[in-house]
């Protein structure tokens, strides 16, 4: 009986470590911010192009027409969709998949190097 409890505790500790690693890996995902508004056919097209990459970043959409986003509206009102990766400008108008791939790979390598 004691052996079983010890194994259960060991399994629980292993599971906790796995969950901690999973949550750490989620934190390591870069944030791709999409500055958008409705309607925006180019934004819809961009989201389709991004589908194959969806497990490699967290997509955050910012509606530039909302009052709290007026700064972004003034900056990007004629240029949406605009993309930032981890807060840095990446591209606008259309998804450049080679640029996106290059930047994602670079960030993924940085994460691997720190682990």
From Swiss-Prot:
Family statement: Belongs to the glutaredoxin family. YDR286C subfamily.
Known InterPro entries for this protein? Glutaredoxin-like, Glutaredoxin-like_YDR286C, Thioredoxin-like_sf
Please name the Pfam families in this protein's record: Glrx-like
Q: What is this protein called?
A: Glutaredoxin-like protein C5orf63 homolog
Keywords (alphabetical) are:
Disulfide bond, Electron transport, Transport
Q: Which cysteines are joined by disulfide bonds?
A: 40-43
Q: Does the keyword Disulfide bond apply?
A: yes
Gene Ontology cellular component terms for the protein in this record: mitochondrion
């Amino acid at each position: 009986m004691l052996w079983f409890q010890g194994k259960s505790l060991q399994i629980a500790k292993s599971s906790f470590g796995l969950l901690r690693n999973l949550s750490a890996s989620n934190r390591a995902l870069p944030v791709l911010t999409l500055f958008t508004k409705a309607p925006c056919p180019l934004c819809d097209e961009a989201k389709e192009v991004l589908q194959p990459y969806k497990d490699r970043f967290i997509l955050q959409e910012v509606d530039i027409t909302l009052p709290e986003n007026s700064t972004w509206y003034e900056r990007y009102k004629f240029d949406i969709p605009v993309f930032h990766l981890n807060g840095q400008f990446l591209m606008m108008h259309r998804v450049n998949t080679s640029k996106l791939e290059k930047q994602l790979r670079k960030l993924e390598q940085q994460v691997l190097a720190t682990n």
